[in-house]
From Swiss-Prot:
This is GTPase Der. GTPase that plays an essential role in the late steps of ribosome biogenesis. It comes from the Bacteria. GO terms for molecular function: GTP binding; ribosome binding. The keyword Isomerase does not apply. The keyword Repeat applies.
């Protein structure tokens, strides 16, 4: 399902990020005890009154060294391009500024719903001053104190009221995948090679992909696929795609819509922090993942080259131990024929269900190999486990005390489940729950 998008805009220091974190709530602070897994704070998903939406903090995309007005223009451009609803944040302490009026004039022309959030209204006496913001011509101002959580419910009500009423329902039989990675890793050339047609215009200059469309195709066995392009959704007019953070945001949106993600690495440049960041987001989102090393034809090789590359990838992406690695060349089409079959296989892993009886046999065998740990004389007791969902496969393990389930033992159980059932290319989630 494609979620509607809400963008937060406003000049610096009005509290955009604080409001973003307040709306996102606990969803923003996802932490896993594995190095390299981080969720970027410029993009997340949120929910209010049973309506889900994607949330963008455009201020997090800015180049802080850019001129003040250029930053604001940049934000407004992103909002106009990406958002279904725009939240315009101003400061109740400072009143209406020239910069606020400048942004308002831009937003007024978008013909998109704009919610005016007057932030930093931290006490009732300040409410009398918010009426000055009617001069911006954007409708009723909403008094907010994002630090204290006051008024955010009213803003959320307004967001939900203005979200598109029809949400695209996607065919569950179609496998959706995206190619993500830094500019100039060869995503466009890979797309062209996979499709066998020049559907996306590619250039050797980084950041020159302009098209923004999903591409549907069918393999020889009748399996339907949708390839999601990371060049931006509903793109119109100029898009600020020269910043790495904007590229990160677009990749995150593509990941959210995908079942399987192809993490593309440029063999000529190796692994960068950007790659780890995006891969971490895909891992946390529970997506199937394939690590694709492109431009393999440009690398000088000996008998140890592949093994050395694989070892380095496993070391740098320790949290992706389940993800297969494939070395390809879009230019020579080396191993590209393997990709559709790998995507299909990993999609099947994402949707695999294990019966409780078979699962519990594996859990009991695991306990026999490695008995449950103790803490202060009390031993963890596992009663049974059951699979509760797919995409990604998620299992609940019922225990006597959740606190006794140490991270290392949970990882051991995960490894035993993987050995028994495979689950190639997909994260699996294990949740300890106290039996009532």
């Amino acid at each position: 399902m494609t979620l509607p998008t809400v963008a937060i805009v406003g000049r610096p220091n009005v509290g955009k990020s604080t409001l973003f974190n307040r709306i996102a709530g606990e969803r923003i602070s996802i932490v896993e005890d594995v190095e390299g897994v981080t969720r970027d704070r410029i993009y997340t998903s949120a929910e209010w009154l049973n309506r889900q939406f994607s949330l963008i903090d455009t201020g997090g995309i800015d180049d802080v060294d850019a001129p003040f007005m250029e930053q604001i223009k940049h934000q407004a451009g992103i909002a106009m391009t990406e958002a279904d609803v725009i939240v315009f944040v101003v400061s109740g302490k400072e009143g209406v500024t020239d910069a606020d009026e400048y942004v308002a004039r831009i937003l007024y022309k978008t013909n998109k719903p704009v919610i005016l959030a007057v932030n930093k209204v931290d006490n009732p006496e300040m409410r009398a001053d918010i009426y000055d913001f009617y001069s911006l011509g954007l409708g009723d101002p909403y008094p907010v104190s994002s630090v204290h959580g006051i008024g955010t419910g009213d803003v959320l009500d307004a967001i939900v009221e203005n979200l598109p009423t029809e949400v695209e329902e996607e065919n569950p039989d179609i496998i959706r995948f995206s190619l993500i990675g830094r500019p100039n890793v060869g995503k466009s050339s890979l797309i062209n090679a996979i499709l066998g047609e020049d559907r996306v215009i590619a250039s050797p200059i980084a950041g020159t992909t302009r098209d923004a469309i999903d591409t549907n195709f069918v393999d020889s066995e009748g399996q339907e696929y949708t390839m999601i392009d990371t060049a931006g959704m509903r793109k119109s007019g100029k898009v600020y795609e020269n910043t790495e953070k904007y590229s990160v945001m677009r990749s995150m949106r593509a990941i959210d819509r995908s079942d399987v993600v192809l993490m593309v690495i440029n063999a000529e440049e190796g692994i960068r922090e950007y790659d780890k960041r995006i891969a971490g987001f895909a891992h946390e989102a529970g997506k199937g993942i394939i690590i694709v090393v492109n431009k393999w034809d440009t690398i000088k090789k000996d008998n140890h080259t592949v093994a050395n590359w694989e070892a380095d990838i496993r070391d740098q992406f320790q949290f992706l131990s389940y993800a297969p690695i494939v070395f390809v060349s879009a230019k020579t089409k080396q191993r590209l024929n393997k990709l559709p079959e790998m995507i299909k296989r990993i999609s099947e892993s994402q949707n695999r269900r294990i019966s409780s009886a078979v699962l519990n046999d594996v859990i009991m065998d695991a306990i026999a190999i490695n008995p449950t740990p103790t803490d202060k004389g009390k031993r963890l007791k596992i009663f049974y486990g059951t699979q509760v969902s797919v995409k990604p496969p998620t299992f609940v393990i019922f225990v006597n005390e959740e606190e006794l389930m140490h991270f290392s033992y949970m990882r051991f159980l995960e490894n035993q489940i993987r050995q028994a059932f495979g689950f190639e290319g997909t994260p699996i989630h294990l949740i300890a729950r106290k039996r009532k």
